[in-house]
Amino acid sequence: MIQYKKFNRALCLLDPYGLHLDWEVMLQAGQSRAVDMFLNFPVMDMNRNAIWKDPDKVPKGGVDRMTKFWGDESWKQVAYAESRQANFFEPEMVKQDNQQIVTAFRERLKKVAGFDHVAEPLPMKNSTKAVVYYLFLASQKSVAEKIIDDIFSKYR
């Protein structure tokens, strides 16, 4: 295992096939304090397989993969909020936009995984301009965030 106390450093590039990535990988990278990580955050796959307008219709496999990717079920509170419109029977859950999910995951990388610096992610679009991924950089070094912010700003 790479450890900060041994002065080892590593760069980890994570490009998961959809939601097929375990949170434990990101958690270990952050807690090692020795790994800088690029992550393609698969927001399109999340929308296709786990975060639907009607959360009750999402297949169990999609929910399970999202939970494994996120690390726990807290993603549900991020992905859905109670509707502000009155409903006489029970509160209706409304799907939140991608930016809310991305912002919450950025905070999760900082607060839960332990990365000190997580750059504002860059949306990666396909040929029809739909966002497929968000490219994250998570690091322990402020200079890494500064460099990536400078590079990403050229593509926003």
For each predicted feature, which ranges?
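Class I S-adenosyl-L-methionine-dependent methyltransferase catalytic core
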Residues: 1-156
